[in-house]
């Protein structure tokens, strides 16, 4: 029996949704532990593309319990829309398997209004927020002003907390040049949401602990990526939650001792959305080629992603921070049309080789990547179903990345569909 965490090993958008979808077959329960609807997991089921922003990818597998933990911030409207869309598509016939932590925090209209207004006034210092209120909601959580799901379904508590928050938030909005928000409409709308959400509410920490005691296999689904972690990422160009494997414990109330395997998801190259340092970024036709061939446009925002060569410094950092036991390598097929492929093996700053990623932003922004060049394979590999059938140069590329990462590659993906995946080792031990 193993409980497995899946984390992004780069700056997000690595293909976690597909990997989680595949691992779900071996898990009993799938748990989302951080972030909000700023994340988008794209899955291809048959010929159908499914994009999920809040609900764990395991929802596409009948009978699997899906849990949204206390570390998540939830936009009720988005959650309800996602549930209804899944039901209409015949993907969620029994929603009793879907649980929400009573302790998760609720995204309010003022969070979104403040998020958008701040970003608009940031000029060239934009973080690249999605404008969905994620950061301001986490601010209220840390500031002990937040509204939790248990508060939302208590009309008296919700009314009091809403009035207190509006007094403060409207003052902020007015300073930002925005119109204040009214109490009545928000109260009525969110009480309607509460009527729908209360059926899903549970003490999910207790539920999950009982599942562990009963020998159930848990799969923890992370959002974003290691380099977007609020503590360990490229601060301040990060998200507002703990995206690393440690967040799986704090974001669910499951003991860290009950986490046995951590799989980091990495593209065979690197992408990033929004601002922030990116040493291997390609601003030429090669970067544009990666973007077009890889379909590198955000599932949540549609924004074009910045693209660059594989960065072993980033992956080694992710291995160390998360305690990765394996790497799932995605989008290897995107590199099939390159004569040669570069891999960043290290950084130089002011002539000195760096041992690890620099914590100081100004240093990171001015790092010079050290590259080695590997031969490409110039063969379409999207139809390959066995690792041994990959072209020799593709296997050499995978082996070199494994050496540089210091961690075994346990899965290779050569396309968006489930069947375009080669599982070298199953973290659930099956």
Swiss-Prot record:
Any note on cofactor binding? Binds 1 Mg(2+) ion per subunit.
Q: What is its main location?
A: cytoplasm
Keywords in alphabetical order:
Cytoplasm, GTP-binding, Ligase, Magnesium, Metal-binding, Nucleotide-binding, Purine biosynthesis
GO terms in the biological process aspect are: 'de novo' AMP biosynthetic process; IMP metabolic process
Provide an example Pfam family for this protein: Adenylsucc_synt
Q: Where does IMP bind?
A: 13-16, 38-41, 130, 144, 224, 239, 303
EC number from the UniProt entry: 6.3.4.4
GO cellular component, alphabetical, reads: cytoplasm
Name the coenzymes or cofactors required. Answer: Mg(2+)
In what pathway does it function? Answer: Purine metabolism; AMP biosynthesis via de novo pathway; AMP from IMP: step 1/2
CDD domains tied to this protein: AdSS (cd03108)
- The positions annotated for binding substrate are 299-305
- The keyword Magnesium is annotated on this UniProt entry: yes
Task: Read off the PROSITE patterns from this record.
Answer: ADENYLOSUCCIN_SYN_1 (PS01266), ADENYLOSUCCIN_SYN_2 (PS00513)
Instruction: Please give the HAMAP family that the UniProt record associates with this protein.
Output: Adenylosucc_synth
By sequence similarity, the record places it as follows: Belongs to the adenylosuccinate synthetase family.
The record's function comment reads: Plays an important role in the de novo pathway of purine nucleotide biosynthesis. Catalyzes the first committed step in the biosynthesis of AMP from IMP.
Q: What name does the UniProt record give this protein?
A: Adenylosuccinate synthetase
Organism this protein belongs to: Trichlorobacter lovleyi (strain ATCC BAA-1151 / DSM 17278 / SZ) (Geobacter lovleyi)
Q: Per UniProt, what is the name of the gene that codes for the protein in this document?
A: purA
